[in-house]
């Protein structure tokens, strides 16, 4: 797939078929995250790949809006170690660094036919406890990972009703040359 096609075809998937993901695909996705650039090459990221159904269920129960996660085959939690990142002028670069690596992971997943969904809305403290994440580590985001279900279920239909606009703004609206 051409890179632009990967970007265009990436969408938030919330329904997956019950099929295990091969370890080589998981390693490919994780390696794509590992190769991301970071501030001063600090590589402050850590990723927790969760396949254990009890852990997945616990994460799903941690927030009412994420109950749908209980049926996903894998969840990946993207974390940052702020002490392993850089700060300059009071700006902590760990969030940006992890987001770059996580997007590499999301796009790599799309490229090999797997679905994802960036999730930032969840109870971070509960998830940290479930996954035994050390106190200094921040959770940046998480995503389910799996083979997308072809049929549109009630969650997808509801999403289309709630989020009506999927049109992207034109380049003319977002690009400024030389000045604002």
Question: What label would you give each PLM region?
Answer:
Residues 1-180:
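Acidic, surface-exposed loops and disordered segments
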